[in-house]
Amino acid sequence: MSKEDSFEMEGTVVDTLPNTMFRVELENGHVVTAHISGKMRKNYIRILTGDKVRVELTPYDLSKGRITYRAR
C-alpha cells in the first residue's frame, strides 16, 4: 500500500484505550480506533481526551486509523 492510497481526516479524541490506542470521532460523525504514529511515539507527544487530531485512514479498513498530528 502506498502513501497515496491513504487519506486524512480531522477528528476529536473521545476515549483513551490501552496500548496507546484512542477512540476518535471524525468530523463526519464516524468513530474510529486509532493508534499513534511512530514519529509521535518517538518524540513523546502526549494525546489527551478532547484533543483535535489528524487521522490517516486507508480505504481497506475504515474503522482503524493512525494519528499523525495533534493540533494545539
Swiss-Prot record:
Principal location class: cytoplasm
Taxonomic source organism: Pseudomonas aeruginosa (strain ATCC 15692 / DSM 22644 / CIP 104116 / JCM 14847 / LMG 12228 / 1C / PRS 101 / PAO1)
Protein role: One of the essential components for the initiation of protein synthesis. Stabilizes the binding of IF-2 and IF-3 on the 30S subunit to which N-formylmethionyl-tRNA(fMet) subsequently binds. Helps modulate mRNA selection, yielding the 30S pre-initiation complex (PIC). Upon addition of the 50S ribosomal subunit IF-1, IF-2 and IF-3 are released leaving the mature 70S translation initiation complex.
GO cellular component terms, A-Z: cytosol
Subunit and partners: Component of the 30S ribosomal translation pre-initiation complex which assembles on the 30S ribosome in the order IF-2 and IF-3, IF-1 and N-formylmethionyl-tRNA(fMet); mRNA recruitment can occur at any time during PIC assembly.
Protein name per its UniProtKB record: Translation initiation factor IF-1
GO MF terms, alphabetically ordered: ribosome binding; rRNA binding; translation initiation factor activity
Cellular localization per UniProt: Cytoplasm
Family: Belongs to the IF-1 family.
Domain S1-like: 1-72
Pfam family name, one: eIF-1a
This protein's UniProt keywords: Cytoplasm, Initiation factor, Protein biosynthesis, RNA-binding, rRNA-binding
